[in-house]
Amino acid sequence: TKEVTNTLVGDDCEINGAARLSDCTLISTPQANVYIGTGVICENSIINYGSSIINSVKMQDSFVGEACQLSNGFTASSSVFFTNCYMSNGEACAAFCGPFTASHHKSSLLIGAQFSFYNAGSATNFSNHAYKMGPLHWGVLERGTKTASGAYLLMPATIGTFSVCF
């Protein structure tokens, strides 16, 4: 591990090869340890019981709840991941990810929305910007929503429970 600054590391955490941990809190127990792996850059974030952050994840200003897995170059900014989320390869910005939210495609971008029991298809993309005005809108994808490969949602939007978006 190259750099750990201003970081509270719980007794049962394992940090192995992280690039940088700065202003973070890693909360663990003997029954549910936190694992931080190779190449991880984490700034101003909280990582909770039983979570693993591995394989060059980049994260800032985020909260990772219990038993979450972030891996394979996933990038997160200003986002919340609650219990049992699985995020791999893609990106999240200002995402409120409820329990069991999953994204594992390189081209998926979760932005400005609330998710729960959500499965992001490959190349899923959200837009919440108006030209030159910055982010304006946010949306809700209710419990059990799935977006198909290449899905594009323009916010504001509310997608109902157990819906599939093409």
Language-model regions: role of each:
Residues 16-19, 24-61, 65-166:
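Glycine-rich hexapeptide-repeat left-handed beta-helix
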